[in-house]
């Protein structure tokens, strides 16, 4: 979970090699599936842009994945990619909260390793 202040910090520090990927189903799935703010009016892309993140993109369907890939590879960083997905049932397994392991798993999935 990332607080909104993190976007301000990223914009201020401006790491060119950073992409924040926010996968948002509009719900709080782990606490019962209540609707979150983004299910209504909160627009994370506008918040990221207002924080000073230079490259911001929102995708809402699987056919935009190639565009998202191009965005990550070609736009100046830091980048914020807001992936809006459909809500679903919570996973039946416990999540891994180890940041190093999550980073490696995400990188391997992204690179097709």
Regions from the language model: what does each represent?
Residues 35-70:
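Conserved thiamine diphosphate
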Residues 11, 36-40, 74-75, 98-100:
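Short, hinge-like loop/turn segments at secondary-structure boundaries
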Residues 14-19, 53-54, 75-78:
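Short coil/turn connectors at secondary-structure junctions
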Residues 1-24:
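Thiamine diphosphate
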Residues 4-6, 31-35, 91-96:
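Short acidic, glycine/serine/threonine-rich loops at helix termini
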């Amino acid at each position: 979970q990332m607080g909104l202040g993190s976007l301000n910090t990223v914009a201020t520090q401006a790491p060119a090699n950073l992409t924040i990927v926010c996968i948002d189903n509009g719900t709080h799935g782990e606490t019962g599936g209540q609707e979150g703010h983004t299910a209504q009016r909160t627009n994370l892309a506008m918040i990221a842009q207002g924080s000073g993140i230079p490259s911001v993109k929102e995708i809402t369907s699987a056919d935009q994945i190639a565009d998202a890939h191009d965005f990550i590879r070609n736009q100046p960083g830091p980048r914020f990619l807001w992936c809006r997905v459909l809500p679903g049932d919570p996973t039946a397994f416990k999540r891994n909260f180890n940041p190093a392991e999550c980073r490696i798993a995400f990188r391997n999935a992204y690179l097709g390793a």
